[in-house]
Structures are given as C-alpha cells and as structure tokens.
C-alpha cells in the first residue's frame, strides 16, 4: 500500500492485531517510517547480539524447566540468558528508537522497550498473546526477561523481585505499587529496566522468583504484612524484650546473702526472746500470772483461715523461699507461730463482723507472717492497753477468783427465772437435760448450737475420743458449724482438733470433778447417773460458744461478764463458780445449760420454768 492510500485510511485504529484506525495520515506515515528505521536497526544489530539457536533453546526450555514451574501463573527465571541489547524491536503495537521512543501507553528505553501487555527483547518480538525473547518467551500470563520479570504492581530490582504481597530485595524491599529499576525507567502502567520486564501476573528475578503468596529473595525476602528482625543471634524479639545482660552471678548471690543476714539480725533484735518459749503475750508485755489465764492454748495454724500463713513449698518458720529464709539457728518459736498468735490477739478485740473486715484489711500479709509481725508490732502498746481494758473483768474472775453472784445481776433477776433458782434446782436441771439427751441419743453439739434434736447413736456408743469425733464428722456436724457460724472464720480443721491435744489441763480438772458430781447426786437423794464424759462435755461448750442467740442472752442477764471471742477463753470461763440465789456454788456451765433450756420455747413455754414441777421431780431419778 502506497503512501497516498495510507493517507486515505485516515481515521483507522492501530489495534493489537495490526490494523490502524483512528489515526491521521501523518501519524500513519510517521509510523511507517519508524517501522522501516526499526527494521534497518534490527538488521544491523542482529550480527551483534544474536545468539546461537541452540543456546537460545537451551535457555528458553531446559533451564526454565529446571528452575521454574510450568503453571499458568508461575514465575520464570533464567540464569544463563543474555542481556537485552542496546537496540530493541517491538511488534506492530510497539515503538522503538535508537535511544528511546514513547508509545501512547508504552515506554521504551535504550536498553528495553515494553508494550502495555508485552515484553520484547533485542532478539525477539512478542505479539499480544506471546512474548518471545532471545532466551525466553512469555505469554500474556508469563514474564520473560534476561534476568528478571516482575508483576505490573510489583517492584523489581537487579537482584530481587517483589509481588503484590511480597517485599523482596537483596539490599532493600519495595512495596507492591512501586517500580524500581537499575536505571529508573517508568511507564504509567509498566516499569521496564535493562534487566527487567513486567508481565501482568508474574514475578521473576535473577536468583529468585516470587508468586503472589511467596516470599523470595536472593538472601532474604520480607512479607508486606510481617515483621522480620535479623540479628546475630537470630532472635530479635528475645533480644529486644529480654536483653542479654552479663551478670556476675556470684556477686549477685553474695549481695542477696548479705541482705538476708541483715534482715535476720534486725528480726532477732526486734523479737529477742524467740530462742525461748516466748508467746505473743510476752512480746506485748503481760505478766506471767496474766498470761496463765490469757494464754492462747488451742490456738495453732488451724486457727488461721485458709490461705493465711498456710502457703506450701516455703520455709515453715517464716513462709519465705528457702534462699531468703530469715530464721536463725536455735530459734524455738517460729515467726509464723507468733504471727498466728498475734492474729488470735486481734480476734480477742473484735466481734465477728469486725474480725472479718480485719482479715480483708491484712490481705497483703496473708502470705507474709514476718511482714505481719512488723505491722502488728507497730501498735504494740495500743493493743496491750486495749486488752487490759476489755479483759479486766475476765482476769478478775479467772485470776483473782472474784465471785459472781446471780443476785447482783438486776437484769438477770428481772428477766429470767433461772436467776431465782437455788443451786440444787440448777444442778437437777443440768442432770435432767443430759439424761434426756442420752435417752434420745441426740447429737450434743447440734442441740446446744440451735436446739436441733438430731439423732446420732454412734456419738453415744463411742468408746474413745477418736470414734466420737469420727461420728460427728460422719453426720456433718463440723461442716454445718462452719457454714452456720463464725467458725467459718477459722481453718476447716480448727474445731475438730479441739477434741484432740488441746485443753489438757481443763480436761484433767473436769475428770477430777466427776467424783464431786457423784456426791452431789447422792446429796440430792437421787439415783446416781452417768455424767457426760469429756468429749460430750466439750461438745456442749463448743455448741454454746457458737450459739449467738444464747450468748447474747447470757451476757445480757449475767452483768458481771462480757464478750469473749476465743474458744479457749470461753471454755476457761465456763468452769468458774457462781453463787445461785440461795448462795450455793454451782459451776457456771450448769447455769449456762439452765439458761439454754429456758430459751427452748418447746420445753419452756414463754421462756419460764415450772418450778413446782421441777421440785416435784427432784426426788425422781435423773439420768439412766
């Protein structure tokens, strides 16, 4: 077709198949001239850059298969291919110049030309569907370059390519929307370099290829959504958050040991009598005769609630790690023992609600008896004075043996028939209550706790203390006691262990008094009956101690006594003697049982005794 005919084709488009429409005649003429010039230049350069066909075939097939996959979207990389020459030819939709030509949508440089969809090298041209190079051919889904091909939206460098999800460089990584070349040529949609051409979906590098979900670099690749830190140890996270520090362990241990020794000396100076059998009352400054009656027998580690001074796997004496133990040789009284005794002293001064709040206040010291002792010792003088005030009446009764007379209690005489009863009547009532309990096989502790007449035959048939306690545990007495009363503020074994090794002195005194009970029964003219043995007797006192209704009534009627909040003090108080209305001496626990019976509305309507019936039955056998 001559030039005039081409001009007449004005307005035709140059499409991907070679047709030229929508272009002016001048443009068509210019294109034709450029085509001829390109053909001449290509012919001249063939002798310079053309490679043997065998070498090309080897590069384009064997080596490609060796390093790459044949999948439609796979990457193709060539190690042994030649670089593109200074001149490049393009197909019918590509512009090429000696130095550079620019198509409407394509950039071509001295070292490379790129079609919008096609890469072509010096020795081959690529049509709209296929790329062919001297060393590689690439279709619309495949890139072929001398050294690397990169996705349209991917960065490529001489030594690295990165796809849309991957950053990979030898020395640096670029993001998925940036083109980087050796020499910097950039098209609006395509990046082309001397060493890189871009296909629409594939990345290829000299030493590594990266698909849309794979990281590949010559030495390292970095994913765009991942953090990679490299260091000499290969673990940057550990080094950043746990820096390696060169610590002189021997020096550290020596310093720690010196601190422990210093703390040990301070504690020994603060509590100097721990080498003897010291208790917390001595530490507070009480005299020995006062300590005898305020002594906290029956108080041990089980007095403490669960979790208070009861951590396992630590030193039993100070509750510290063995490396930090502050106990010293020859120490007979541990700091933990003094701490639980100090806790018992605080219980002496508080009712149930106040003590519960106190336990919450000292929560930071629940695992630190040494720290609690320091806290306790700060108010040492204040605690001593408070005990002297609150327990003056108790020491007067138990230590000086001051007599309690029911007639001195105005509220008692006005509010209870028991306070107008003679000593004989009180004793008869006491024996009668026990006789009824024995006959009905009633559970003693539960009865005195809330007047509940549950049956427990095993308790009455027990031959020794162990069987007796097992019977109580079997019927759930201790569990109910903890759930219903302030016994829950102590350890779960506290009440149970009161029947074992505690109260030995009081037990001896009680068993010696059994002969007195026999003489009393003979003097009353009744057939002697069995009096309760020690375990049943202690069950009665424990039930009365945790019976809040009874306690409040007794303390209101008997004006000479006040509140006691420790079981040992209650048991000791119950064994003092009082003067009945006829000035006869009776143990206080007998008066307690009489008041308890009076409060039992089922047997004593309106809380009053029928004195006439009681006297009428005085000659009748009491007990078995």
UniProtKB/Swiss-Prot annotation:
InterPro entries: RLR_Helicase
Coiled-coil annotated residue ranges, if any: none
Compositionally biased residues, Basic and acidic residues: 226-249
Record-level GO cellular component terms: cytoplasm
Start and end residues of each stretch annotated as Disordered: 113-249
Low complexity compositional bias, start-end: 118-225
Descriptive protein name: Putative uncharacterized protein YHR219W
């Amino acid at each position: 077709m001559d030039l005039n005919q081409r001009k007449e084709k004005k307005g035709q488009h140059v499409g991907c198949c070679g047709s030229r429409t929508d272009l002016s005649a001048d443009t068509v003429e210019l294109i034709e001239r450029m085509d001829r010039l390109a053909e001449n230049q290509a012919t001249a350069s063939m002798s310079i850059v053309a490679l043997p066909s065998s070498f090309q075939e080897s590069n384009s097939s064997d080596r490609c298969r060796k390093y790459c996959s044949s999948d439609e979207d796979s990457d193709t990389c060539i190690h042994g291919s030649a670089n593109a020459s200074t001149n490049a030819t393009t197909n019918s939709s590509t512009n090429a110049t000696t130095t550079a030509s620019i198509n409407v949508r394509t950039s071509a440089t001295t070292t490379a030309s790129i079609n919008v969809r096609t890469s072509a090298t010096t020795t081959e041209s690529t049509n709209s569907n296929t790329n062919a190079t001297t060393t590689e051919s690439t279709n619309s889904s495949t890139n072929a370059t001398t050294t690397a091909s990169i996705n349209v939206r991917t960065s490529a460098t001489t030594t690295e390519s990165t796809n849309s999800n991957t950053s990979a460089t030898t020395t640096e990584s670029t993001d998925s929307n940036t083109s980087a070349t050796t020499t910097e040529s950039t098209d609006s949609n395509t990046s082309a370099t001397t060493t890189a051409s871009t296909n629409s979906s594939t990345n290829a590098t000299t030493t590594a290829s990266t698909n849309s979900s794979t990281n590949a670099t010559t030495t390292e690749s970095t994913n765009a959504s991942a953090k990679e830190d490299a260091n000499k140890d290969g673990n940057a996270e550990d080094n950043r958050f746990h820096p390696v520090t060169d610590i002189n362990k021997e020096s550290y241990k020596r310093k720690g040991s010196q601190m422990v020794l210093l703390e040990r000396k301070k504690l020994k100076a603060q509590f100097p009598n721990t080498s003897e059998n010291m208790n917390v009352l001595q530490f507070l400054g009480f005299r020995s005769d006062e300590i005898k009656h305020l002594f906290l027998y029956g108080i041990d580690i089980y007095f403490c609630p669960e979790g208070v001074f009861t951590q396992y796997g630590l030193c039993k004496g100070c509750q510290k790690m063995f490396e930090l133990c502050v106990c010293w040789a020859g120490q007979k009284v541990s700091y933990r023992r003094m701490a639980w005794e100090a806790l018992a002293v605080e219980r002496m001064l508080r009712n149930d609600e106040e003590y519960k709040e106190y336990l919450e206040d000292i929560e930071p010291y629940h695992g630190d008896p040494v720290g609690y002792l320091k806290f306790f010792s700060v108010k040492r003088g204040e605690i001593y004075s408070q005990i002297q005030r609150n327990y003056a009446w108790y020491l007067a009764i138990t230590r000086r043996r001051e007599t309690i007379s029911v007639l001195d209690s105005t509220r008692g005489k006005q509010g209870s028939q028991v306070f107008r009863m003679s000593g004989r009547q009180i004793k008869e009532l006491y024996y009668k209550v026990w006789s009824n309990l024995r006959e009905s096989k009633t559970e003693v502790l539960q009865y005195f706790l809330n007047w509940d007449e549950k049956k427990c035959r095993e308790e009455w048939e027990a031959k020794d203390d162990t069987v007796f306690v097992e019977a109580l545990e079997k019927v759930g007495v201790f569990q109910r006691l903890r759930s219903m009363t302030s016994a829950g503020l102590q350890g779960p074994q506290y009440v149970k262990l009161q029947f074992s090794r505690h109260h030995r002195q009081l037990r001896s005194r009680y068993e010696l008094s059994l002969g007195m009970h026999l003489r009393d029964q003979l003097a009353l003219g009744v057939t002697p009956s069995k009096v309760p043995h020690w375990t049943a007797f202690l069950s009665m006192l424990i039930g009365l101690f945790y019976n809040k209704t009874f306690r409040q009534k007794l303390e209101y009627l008997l004006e000479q006594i006040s509140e006691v909040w420790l079981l040992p003090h209650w048991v000791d108080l119950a064994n003092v003697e009082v003067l009945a209305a006829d000035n006869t001496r009776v143990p206080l626990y007998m008066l307690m049982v009489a008041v308890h019976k009076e409060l039992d509305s089922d047997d004593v309507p309106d809380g009053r005794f029928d004195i006439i019936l009681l006297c009428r039955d005085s000659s009748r056998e009491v007990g078995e």
